[in-house]
């Protein structure tokens, strides 16, 4: 247990924030570069959300409070539910139309 607590001496808050900013940047890059495929867009948004969760966990460790970690777990749970619903809708749309490109989805009328 003491070895885990001593690990924070080597990994500072700056390391967590740099990692978070890199993951967020990769998500933004994926979002802007792959605009045609909805699956790539969803994965990029999930990466950006994970970067925000890394920030919550890092600041909760730095402030020595559990609220950020609990909030991060709640966010991950809700995001998993949203993603599963979104993928189910996309699967049904793909079975009906045969394509999940953004240009085809934009032409959808209700």
Curated annotation (Swiss-Prot):
Molecular function GO labels: NADH:ubiquinone reductase (non-electrogenic) activity; quinone binding
Function: NDH-1 shuttles electrons from NADH, via FMN and iron-sulfur (Fe-S) centers, to quinones in the respiratory chain. The immediate electron acceptor for the enzyme in this species is believed to be ubiquinone. Couples the redox reaction to proton translocation (for every two electrons transferred, four hydrogen ions are translocated across the cytoplasmic membrane), and thus conserves the redox energy in a proton gradient.
CC annotations in GO: NADH dehydrogenase complex; plasma membrane
Keyword Cell inner membrane: yes
Short name of any one Pfam family annotated for the protein: Oxidored_q2
Presence of keyword Transport: yes
Domain of life of the source: Bacteria
Location of the protein in the cell: Cell inner membrane
EC number: 7.1.1.-
InterPro entries xrefs: NADH_UbQ_OxRdtase_chain4L/K (IPR001133), NUOK/Mnh_C1-like (IPR039428)
Gene3D superfamilies according to UniProt: 1.10.287.3510
Annotated gene: nuoK
Native source species: Rickettsia felis (strain ATCC VR-1525 / URRWXCal2)
Subunit details: NDH-1 is composed of 14 different subunits. Subunits NuoA, H, J, K, L, M, N constitute the membrane sector of the complex.
Name of the protein described by the UniProt record: NADH-quinone oxidoreductase subunit K
GO biological process: one example: ATP synthesis coupled electron transport
Family under the similarity heading: Belongs to the complex I subunit 4L family.
Keywords (A to Z) from UniProt: Cell inner membrane, Cell membrane, Membrane, NAD, Quinone, Translocase, Transmembrane, Transmembrane helix, Transport
Transmembrane intervals: 13-33, 41-61, 73-93
Membrane topology: Multi-pass membrane protein
Catalytic activity: a quinone + NADH + 5 H(+)(in) = a quinol + NAD(+) + 4 H(+)(out)
PANTHER family the UniProt entry points to: NADH DEHYDROGENASE SUBUNIT 4L-RELATED, NADH-UBIQUINONE OXIDOREDUCTASE SUBUNIT ND4L
């Amino acid at each position: 247990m003491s070895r885990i607590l001593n690990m924070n001496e080597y990994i500072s808050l700056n390391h967590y924030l740099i990692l978070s900013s890199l993951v967020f940047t990769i998500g933004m890059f994926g979002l802007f570069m792959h605009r045609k495929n909805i699956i790539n867009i969803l994965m990029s948004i999930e990466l950006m959300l994970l970067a925000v969760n890394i920030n919550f966990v890092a600041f909760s460790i730095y402030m020595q409070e559990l609220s950020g970690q609990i909030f991060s777990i709640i966010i991950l749970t809700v995001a998993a539910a949203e993603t599963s619903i979104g993928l189910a809708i996309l699967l049904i749309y793909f079975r009906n139309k045969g394509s999940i490109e953004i240009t085809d989805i934009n032409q959808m009328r209700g």
